Every structure is written in structure tokens, then in C-alpha cells.
Amino acid sequence: MIKHFLEDNSDDAELSKFVKDFPGSEPCHPTESKTRVARPQILEPRPQSPDLCDDDVEFRATLWSQPSDSQQYFCPPAPLSPSSRPRSPWGKLDPYDSSEDDKEYVGFATLPNQVHRKSVKKGFDFTLMVAGESGLGKSTLVNSLFLTDLYRDRKLLGAEERIMQTVEITKHAVDIEEKGVRLRLTIVDTPGFGDAVNNTECWRPVAEYIDQQFEQYFRDESGLNRKNIQDNRVHCCLYFISPFGHGLRPLDVEFMKALHQRVNIVPILAKADTLTPSEVDRKKCKIREEIEHFGIKIYQFPDCDSDEDEDFKLQDQALKESIPFAVIGSNTVVEARGRRVRGRLYPWGIVEVENPGHCDFVKLRTMLVRTHMQDLKDVTRETHYENYRAQCIQSMTRLVVKERNRNKLTRESGTDFPIPAVPPGTDPETEKLIREKDEELRRMQEMLHKIQRQMKETH
């Protein structure tokens, strides 16, 4: 049989044993007329060249010796086993892709890698708002956080110009890349906030700007081309609190209460180098008590998962206890104990920006950039934006119901009910508010009709 032409000491001894034990190698008998059957071929590895890797082994065909009529023929051997076949070219992206795991490994464990590659290719957006009165170091702190100069084109106003200055909204956008990860950072500044003698409702332009970004995103999301939506929603607001005083001022309370339902507020105790360590602790405790007393909802750190390591839990607890963050900003590099650090030089010593014993700058940067940036974006999308979106849909629904009821009454009575005009003698400010509200209602009604048409076309 097979032993007639395969010797035990030959190179094909293992093949003989494999064919004998292999369940799919059924013997094939020649026909009764003893017709000469073509000689079968087997693949035998050629000696490997030093230029070839393990995955590029070539095979050559060798002919067997002339079989006799009584010999049996068998089917070709099975394909290469998983342990000897070439690995996938995606193996470097799949840490679980190994020959030993092929029988039980499906491959969906690579989904995080796929999401990571796609996210890195697309890049990330983050919009940060800084608010507070002038002179608290907002621009310096932002430049220190992201190691870039975002205010190189800023024009400093004189004393007379500051008197007449009103609250403005300015945007500074910059692309930052670090280790192949691209971040499109937008800084929203509020020059003029809190600088006037009468600061009544000076927070209103800031609230209107946040609502405008929500409205623009809602319009883009409701349109047909939703693939390239630019996300300009404000993800975080750093509110700077003056170190001079005994706690929160009425303006601070009014601002945070007006915006805490619209944006994630992170309170900042500015210019911490003007306070002693004991004063910093007392002022932090006082600010936390007043925030709770006035019902202000600042950004809440998410609870740690049960499977988090102890170091991360301790770090998260330290961040929670540091609210409000007492920070120092500086773009100056000074010499301290034989090394160059960013800080401020005083006659009595050096204050280092990145020294945790001097201020909370490192903790703020860790929270804002390294650990909670994505959570800030998630809370903005899932809470603040959804609240605005729900209000818009409810308003549009009420408008549609009101319009349908009016049309129904018109059809039943056969007469039109004209929209009542503005009563005579109304002051100009009230007329302006009424016109703005009517214009807003018309825009929302048009948007609802547009959504309804798109839904009909889709179905």
C-alpha cells in the first residue's frame, strides 16, 4: 500500500502518518480497465532563502515514483493548519490575533482600535469659554494651559475706552497637534464683563451666545447634510472669581445661576499668589458653602467605576476637593534651583505655576485636558443641549397646535381672526421685544415645517 513507495526514513514519513490518520483522505481505486491514472503531486517546502520571511515560503512540486496497479490513490492533504499558516497583515493592529486563539477568537475585541483610528483621523473639537472681570489673568491662564499664544493679535484698550466698553464675545481658534492627535481648540472670551459701573444683566450676551450655538447646531442637525456638522457648542466655562473679598459677589451669583443650566461651569479662584495658603483654604471653603446655599449647579465630576485602580480614585477625590481651583498663570520662564520653570519672581521667592504645592494649575489641567475633557463634551451633548432641544420641540409643537386650532375655527366660522396688533401706547422697548418674539416664533415654525417635509420625503 502506501508503504510500498514511502519509506519510514524518507522526508515524507510524516505525510504518510498524516494521511493515514486524516479522516478525509478516502482511498481512490483505479478503474477495472487499469487505465493509466495521472500521477498525483504533493507540495514539498523548498529550502528557505535568507531573503524570505516565514510568511513567504515557496513550494515546489515533486513527482512520485511509478505506482503499480495494486496501489491505492488518495486525496491531497488538508490545507495548512492555523499554527503554520501566514498571519493576517492586520495582526499588528490586533493584539489578540494569534494562531493559538483562532478557534475561539472572533475579532470584535478590535473595535476599540477601530474607533481609536477613526477618531484620531477625524480629530477632536473643544470649545472653552472664559468669563470674569478684567485683570484676573484669564488670557495668561489659557496660554499656560495649552502652551500656545492665542492672544497675540489682541489690542489693549485705554482707560477711556474701557469706560464705554460693553460686553463682547470674541473667538480665538487654533489647531493643536500632540503625538499625532489633532485638537481644534476654540477659546470664547468675554471682554468687558463686569467692568462697568452698572453690571445689571451683563451676563445676557453670554447666555444669548450659548443659545445661538445650540440653535445653529439644532438647525444643522435637522438639515439634510449632517455629515460635516461643525460643533461650536460651548463645552466648558471657566468662571474667574476675584481673590479680593470674602466670597462670591452678587454678580458672581447672578452669572452662575443664569448659565448653570446652559453650560458646564468650573469656578476658578484667580491670582492665588496674592493669598497665603491658609487664606486660600478659607476662601475655598466659603465659596463652596455659598455655591451650595444659592443652589448653583457647577460641573459635577462623575463617580469612579468600581474596577478603577486606587491611584485613579485618589486622584479623582483630590480633584473634587480642589473646587474652586486656585490657579496662577505665567508665560515667563525663570531660574529656580538650577532649573528653568514657568512662574513669577518676587523679592521673597519664586512662585512656580506647575508646582502642586503652590497652586492648583496642574490639577486644573489634568481635569480639563487629560481626564474629563470627553466627559465635559458628553454632559454638554446629553444634558444641556438636549434640554434646549426639548424646549425647541415643545415650542414648535405648541405653535403647530395653535395654528391648527385657529385654522379649524376659521373654517367653521368662515371668517379670519387677524393677529391682534400691538396695543397703542406701548413703549418702544416692549414693541421691540414683541417683534423679536414674533420673529423667533416664525423661525421655529418654518423649521418645524421643514422637518415635517423631510420626514414625509423619507417615508
UniProtKB/Swiss-Prot annotation:
Residues 122-395 form the Septin-type G domain. Residues 189-192 are annotated as: G3 motif. Its main location: cytoplasm. Residues 270-273 are annotated as: G4 motif. It holds the Pfam family Septin. It comes from the Eukaryota. Disulfide bonds: none annotated. One of its GO terms (molecular function) is magnesium ion binding. Residues 434-459 form a coiled coil. Keywords: Cell cycle, Cell division, Cell projection, Cilium, Coiled coil, Cytoplasm, Cytoplasmic vesicle, Differentiation, Flagellum, GTP-binding, Nucleotide-binding, Phosphoprotein, Spermatogenesis. The modification Phosphothreonine is found at T415. The modification Phosphoserine is found at S10, S49, S98, S99, S306, S413. It is found in: Cytoplasm; Cell projection, Cilium, Flagellum; Cytoplasmic vesicle, Secretory vesicle; Cell projection, Axon. InterPro entries: G_SEPTIN_dom, P-loop_NTPase, Septin. Phosphorylated by DYRK1A. Filament-forming cytoskeletal GTPase. Pro-apoptotic protein involved in LGR5-positive intestinal stem cell and Paneth cell expansion in the intestines, via its interaction with XIAP. May also play a role in the regulation of cell fate in the intestine. Positive regulator of apoptosis involved in hematopoietic stem cell homeostasis; via its interaction with XIAP. Negative regulator of repair and hair follicle regeneration in response to injury, due to inhibition of hair follicle stem cell proliferation, potentially via its interaction with XIAP. This is Septin-4. It comes from Rattus norvegicus.
